[in-house]
Amino acid sequence: MQLWQLNPQARWRRTLKGGAALLPETAATVELDAEAFTAVSLLKTPLTARRLRHQLIAQFNRNFTLAETDILLRDLAAQGFLVESRAEQSASSVPGSASPGSQSHAPESVHLQLNNVCNLRCPSCYLGLHEDDRDLLSLARLCALIDECAEMGVFQLALGGGEALLSPKFAPVARYARQRGLVPNVTTNGWLITEKLLDEVQGSLGELRLSLNDAVTVNKALLEEKAALLRARRMRFGFNLIVTQRNLNRLSELLEWACAQGAATINLIRPKPAPGNDRWYTDNALTRADAARLLAVLKDMEPLFTQTALTVDCAFSFLFHGQSARQLESRGVAGCAMGERFATIKWNGDVYPCSHLHGEEFRAGSVLSESFRDIWERSQVFTKLRRDLPQVNGHCGGCAHNAFCKGCRAAMQQRTGDWLAADTDCPVPVAQAQTKALI
């Protein structure tokens, strides 16, 4: 009989809905419901499908067919999360492997702000930089944070700033994160990328994201040069692009250009209001009509994305309205997941549920005075947010798509003063009203 066990290289974490797994080498992830995650947790020792089925029946007191158990095992094996086993081996015996069930609920990704300074002054910036780069988070403290994240089961570390590459701690942090089994990624404006710097992080970064910003205040020739350096080293890279009123008419051209550079991914970002960028936001924010146009452009451009993956940030989840739960899950669409899948540690040690939330009422604690785990698990801010997030107001609250969207809470907080307000940019209510008018 065929025996299955966990891939020793896979990392696992609990989620509020079940669990998830990551293969650090490829950054491939999979989401599992509670039953599937329990099934996987039983594979810390090798089992056959038949034996696993018997244990699941005993645990959940319901019938599991051998066919559905076998399908689950073979599907996870095809994705690389399970491997065929010899009876004497156990995945949990592999040093450094994180097995399911060994952690409490943990964030999938932690955004770690290495500094608060930048060599550019982009009008779209949401951070409100203050040119304050005091060494509040020493390299030793950052490494201790990485240790905590690894022990909790965090998958990815999103390194940022400011401009992360200005920090002398960037390369050591990236290397140490990889050593601890996390996948460190970084977003940068690209100006400071050099051969020497790439030597220091070769083999450590999961992906380097070059910021196209809003494609107005960016030097495309510079980004082409940096992309060529990354291609020559076979380092995985992508682009971040803020989609705005001003560049929506050029979006097809920009996507074609980014694909031509050899990008592994292109991530489209929704404009977000923040202290200090009010004028830019007013001039560039997408209307509901713009959002509908964006969806049409993406559908037309779909054949382009054979070698390059196109992703959107969670604030654009309303673009997928109308798709089934299975389709949304397969695309990784989970909507606003601040405080559940993500958290931010700012340059001064303050912890927030989201990089785009500002204000003392959203400050969950400081890693200068307490552990990140304690903040994540016990902070009143996170507890209240997780309780209230499903209860968004207006059309968002009554939307059938709510579980996979919830709008952009940070944008609504800045715009209306109420983080639970209905998302005013969502095109779905207009489309529904137009449909009703035709009936």
Model-predicted regions and their roles:
Residues 70-93, 350-378, 382:
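A broadly conserved sequence feature marking short terminus-proximal activation segments
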Residues 1-43:
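Acidic, low-complexity/disordered tracts enriched in E/D and polar residues
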Residues 117-121, 129, 347, 395, ...:
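Short pre-active-site segment immediately N-terminal to redox-active cysteine/selenocysteine motifs
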Residues 1-3, 274-360, 390-393, 404:
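A C-terminal junction/extension of Radical SAM enzymes
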Residues 127, 136-160, 166-287:
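Radical SAM/AdoMet-radical enzyme domain recognition
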Residues 28-111, 398:
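Long, charge-rich, low-complexity alpha-helical segments
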Residues 356-439:
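Flexible mid-to-C-terminal extensions adjoining Fe-S/redox cofactors in radical SAM and related proteins
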Residues 103-140:
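Canonical Radical SAM [4Fe-4S] cluster-binding loop centered on the CxxxCxxC motif
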